A protein has these predicted regions:
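Face-selective signature of the C-terminal outer-membrane beta-barrel domain
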Residues: 1-145, 235, 283-302
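Outer-membrane beta-barrel strand-turn architecture
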Residues: 64-68, 123-128, 161, 169-173, ...
Length: 302
């Protein structure tokens, strides 16, 4: 093997537009009958939206052998992601077509993501034994700005170490034993993080949690395989767990005088207040067995 360095760049853009109308019609416009549109204060509305996601990725990878048994891998990646949304909402009185711009129901925001990561890996191969540990570091910086509509500007930073390790052993010419561990992370979305106190309906209040951490899932796997002219056998065991899943938390305001939140926001007595927290826990275990028997040159049983 020889030393190798790889440089790569990728750009991706996904613009979308949406233009929709919602119109109410009175199918029985008899003057003597109930005008349902006026009775229920229904309004025609028009929504004109534009969204775009643009992502650029810069990456460098380097691999070098050390002697006949060892290999070192290292690299770095930078991702710049820009999400923009501009949704304009127009309302008309009753069933008319005289639409007027409603800023309170419109929204426009910019979401910038800077993701920096670096990794290092080592591989040892000796006869039938393979050992491969690795470690990746990720730093994520988010900036969210609301230009129109309800929302609160905020920044968030995440720092994560992501380890992995794998082992492989050849048990003779036709048998293999493998095991490993890896971690996966999920970062909270802007709606989970946004600290805006949404009390448009004062009895159902929603607020994000800017103190959320990345959700981490740990997985362990062990597998055995054997291949002969008559039988192919594969047995695998997998276990994964998560101790800090992002879940919705809701509670009733039980204080007769209501409750005051950070920023001076007040939730009245009896309101349902909802936010998010790293409170989720999950466990999953799976066992898989596969057998392929070549009973005869023309018969194969799975």
């Amino acid at each position: 093997k020889e030393r190798m360095i790889t440089l790569s760049y990728k750009i991706n853009s996904q613009p979308q537009t949406n233009d929709s109308y919602n119109t109410y019609l009175d199918i029985e416009p008899d003057e003597n009958k109930l005008d349902i549109i006026k009775e229920l204060s229904l309004k025609n509305f028009h929504s004109d939206g534009k969204t775009n996601t643009m992502e650029q990725t810069f990456q460098v990878d380097y691999t070098t052998p050390i002697g006949k048994l060892h290999t070192i891998e290292t690299g770095a990646k930078y991702i710049f992601r820009r999400n923009s949304s501009d949704n304009r909402f127009y309302e008309a009185e009753g069933a008319s077509e005289n639409y007027a711009y409603n800023e309170n129901r419109s929204s426009e925001y910019r979401h910038l993501n800077h993701i920096l990561s670096a990794y290092a890996g080592y591989t040892l191969k000796y006869k039938g034994f393979t050992f491969k540990p690795g470690l990746r570091y990720e730093q994520t910086i988010q900036e969210v700005k609301y230009l129109v509509g309800p929302g609160e500007n905020f920044d968030s930073n995440f720092s994560d170490l992501v380890p992995s390790v794998s082992l492989g052993i050849k048990l003779g010419k036709t048998q293999n034993l493998r095991g490993g561990y890896n971690m996966r992370i999920w970062r909270p979305g802007i709606w989970n993080l946004n600290p805006y106190f949404d009390n448009q309906n004062p009895m159902f209040i929603n607020q994000g949690n800017p103190n959320l951490k990345s959700e981490k899932s740990h997985s362990f796997d062990l597998s055995y395989s054997s291949f002969t002219s008559k039988f192919n056998i594969n047995l695998s065991l997998r276990h994964s767990f998560n101790n800090n899943g992002i879940e919705r938390i809701s509670r009733l305001i039980t204080d007769k005088d209501g409750e005051i939140f950070e920023g001076g926001h007040k939730a009245p007595y009896g309101a349902l207040y909802s936010t998010y927290g790293n409170i989720g826990k999950s466990r999953e275990t799976g066992l898989n067995f596969y057998l392929n028997w070549n009973a005869s040159p023309k018969t194969r049983i799975y």
